[in-house]
Amino acid sequence: MSISNLILVLIGIAIAFLFTAAAESTTANNNEEKETQWSDIEYLIDANNDTMVNYKNLFGLNIGKVYNPNFVDDADWFLGSSNYEDHIGYYLIPYNYNWHFYSNISAPWYGCEAQSKAMLVTAKKYNETGDPKYLEFSKKVFNGLNSSVINHDGWLLGLVSKNKNATILNSQMFCVANLMTYYEYTGDERALTLFKKGVDVLEKNINDLSGNCGTYYSLSKNRLVSVKQHPEYMKMLERLYLMTGSEMLKNTLYKWQHDYLTCR
């Protein structure tokens, strides 16, 4: 998911940046760095061909090189003992770095995007290999997504931390759509049930989160996302509309498309 280059001044913007920066970059082969329009960030490939993010001294945070699970495509990386937490019956996929820009988010913190990424990558690996360890892992990650930690009555939290939780519109769209893909991989009816609940939540809230020439970033409605960022939002919403045939989502998609053409 890509987001236009903008000055991040709120915690919501900071979190949005973490979740969406990768799509702005282009992948390079072997150990070459990835290019990004944010000059202070690099996407690197480690010796195992896994993506690392070098945040350097972004916003003075001194995060340096870390693994952001949103950007990892290697099922075996997720199975590494330091990359998931076993909570007896479900797994959580942590972000193992602090994010203290206009916030107090200390590691570990969590969100539905990391959960759904790990869930899909390992389910896909199971389909490719038939190795049951990947299916078992994927199911426990789904259990984490469906747990009360992240699933709040159909809202799949985009941020879960000790001091702050956030219901984020683009995270909801992304994670709900991933549930349908997971269902297609596994046939797990629980995923289909949660998908339907997540769509219902979107249908009930998306009008309220659609403002004039923008959308509200989260239920807190403390930030309006500019229509300049809507191409990626529209792609996610269109994906959900094609999955559901929902008239509500279709009408909202048309509104966003109209706003994008007229409000810039």
Predicted regions and their residues:
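N-terminal Sec-pathway targeting helices
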Residues: M1-I11
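Terminal, non-catalytic domain-edge segments
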Residues: A14, F19, A23-V66, Y185, ...
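Long, well-ordered core segments of solenoidal/helical folds
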Residues: N30-N48, Y67-L92, L135-W155, R190-G214, ...
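Carbohydrate-binding/catalytic loop surfaces
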Residues: E32-D50, H87-Y110, D153-S171, S210-M236
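Well-ordered alpha-helical segments within folded domains of soluble proteins
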Residues: N48-F71, W109-N127, T167-Y183, L224-L242
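N-terminal accessory/assembly segment that mediates macromolecular interactions
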Residues: I63-Y67, D74-K117
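Eukaryote-skewed repeat-based solenoidal scaffolds used as protein-protein interaction platforms
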Residues: P94-Y95, I105-N205
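Charge-dense, low-complexity intrinsically disordered segments
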Residues: P132, E189, L224-V227, E247
